[in-house]
Amino acid sequence: LPPCCTPPKKHCPAPACKYKPCCKS
């Protein structure tokens, strides 16, 4: 999967993003 959080974000619309440390609140 492509990086869903670059740059790091506190919220990501993609379901898989919540599993990435950079996207966790």
Swiss-Prot record:
Reported tissue expression: Expressed by the venom duct.
A single GO cellular-component term on record: extracellular region
Record site: Significant for high potency for Kv1.2/KCNA2: K9
Disulfides per UniProt: C4-C17, C5-C22, C12-C23
Modified residues (4-hydroxyproline): P2, P3, P7, P8, P13, P15, P21
Miscellaneous information on this protein: Negative results: has no or very low potency for Kv1.1/KCNA1, Kv1.3/KCNA3, Kv1.4/KCNA4, Kv1.5/KCNA5, Kv1.6/KCNA6, Kv7.2/KCNQ2-Kv7.3/KCNQ3, and KCa1.1/KCNMA1.
Annotated domain remarks: The cysteine framework is III (CC-C-C-CC).
Known function: Kappa-conotoxins inhibits voltage-gated potassium channels. This toxin dose-dependently and reversibly inhibits the Kv1.2/KCNA2 channel in mammalia. Does not exert protective effect on cardiac tissue when administered after an ischemic event.
Family classification: Belongs to the conotoxin M superfamily.
Protein name: Kappa-conotoxin RIIIJ
Source species taxonomy: Eukaryota, Metazoa, Spiralia, Lophotrochozoa, Mollusca
